[in-house]
Amino acid sequence: MTQVSVATMMSQRFRGYLPVVIDVETGGFNPRQDALLEIGATLLTMDEQGQLVPDQQFSAHITPFEGANVEQSALDFTGIRLDSPLRQQAAVSESDALGELFKQVRKAIKSHDCTRAILVGHNAAFDHGFLNAAIERCVIKRNPFHPFSSLDTASLSALAYGQTVLARACQAAGIPFDQQNAHSAGYDAERTATLFCSIINRYRDLGGWELTLREQAMEAREEEE
């Protein structure tokens, strides 16, 4: 790899967008009516070899907003116990959770010479919908994420590994997946991030991404000289 900085590689790889993996656990399927109960995030960076790797992690238990609906079927699916003393002690408001997350995201955007973050998620439209609804409820003016574009690992996994379920896609990629920790926003975000990196790096190793090809051509010319 020639002397191209990590920040430059990241900013050029995704057209100035910094990919940030988001996972949410909720009280249902309606982002405007149902509660946002957990949010997890994994930021990404590049190593000196140009490989995409997981970086900082963030997770928060969230107190349901006033008037929020919580379906019992959703709690049964996620295993979240709203009456858990540990959860009640740790839970914060949507505003506080997003404020802390966005502070970390903005810092990472700046350090990677990017202009904005882009949400990466497994079935990304679901996570994006709940994130945008929470941003609207909290009247957050400076949203670091692109408001509608996203990168979906369910679709990418179908292309790369022939799987769309997160656990099965991880298995196909050789990534350990603990079913007991599934549907924890922090864990799912970290596993999704590892899966996304696997797909992007595999594509690069197979000869994709224009910057990689340019770098290889430059290295070849330098060797000839």
Could you say what each language-model-derived stretch is?
Residues 109, 126-148:
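Substrate-recognition/cap helix-loop segment adjacent to the acidic, metal-dependent catalytic center
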Residues 118-125, 129-130, 134-135, 167-225:
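Acidic, Mg2+-coordinating catalytic module of metal-dependent nucleases/exonucleases
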Residues 62-78, 82-85, 153-189:
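Active-site-proximal helix-loop-helix substrate-binding element of RNase H-like nuclease domains
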Residues 29-31, 158, 194:
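Conserved protein kinase catalytic core
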Residues 2-122, 225:
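Conserved non-catalytic scaffold segment of RNase H-like nuclease domains
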Residues 141, 160-162, 215-219:
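Catalytic phosphate/metal-binding cores of nucleic-acid and nucleotide-processing enzymes, i.e., regions
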